[in-house]
A protein has these predicted regions:
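N-terminal low-complexity, Ser/Thr- and acidic-residue-enriched intrinsically disordered segments
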Residues: 1-41
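A conserved cap/lid and substrate-binding interface adjacent to the catalytic center
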Residues: 38-135
């Protein structure tokens, strides 16, 4: 069962994932700077000191899917070492309302699910191999 601290860390990283300046490999002082517009200085420093952005993807907000996701990894010598967290952003742009309509009428936001699966397949495929991708 997750502890209150686990739940808090997940919520903090989920909030941090809404920052537009995230890129793969961001960590330390650069991550703190990127998070400063969204988080308080104390929280931005906490995230920058304890986590690295492993992968960040932002969907095309005009293609019908605006799936956005971030994978965080705890840094060595921190309480979060070797832990991986996945954060996905919710509805924020006009096309997301199209996805919400798809969800309401078809039981799934199909374009966003396809984008999420394709992103996961790309980042988990070994270097030098072709990643399997799905299409609607």
């Amino acid at each position: 069962m997750p502890t209150v601290n686990d739940t808090y860390i997940n919520a903090l990283l989920a909030d941090a994932a809404y920052e537009k300046k995230l890129v793969d490999g961001l960590q330390g002082a650069d991550l703190i700077t990127a998070l400063s517009p969204r988080l308080t200085p104390t929280l931005a420093k906490f995230v920058g000191d304890n986590f690295t952005v492993v992968s960040h993807v932002e969907g095309s907000h005009w293609s019908g899917s605006s799936f956005d996701g971030t994978i965080w990894r705890g840094k060595a010598d921190t309480p979060y070492a070797n832990k991986t967290y996945v954060s996905m952003r919710g509805t924020q742009e006009l096309p997301d309302f199209v996805a919400d309509l798809d969800l309401a009428t078809n039981s799934a936001a199909r374009a966003e699910i396809a984008d999420m699966v394709n992103w996961w397949l790309r980042i988990t495929t070994p270097v030098g191999q072709m990643a399997t991708q799905i299409a609607l």
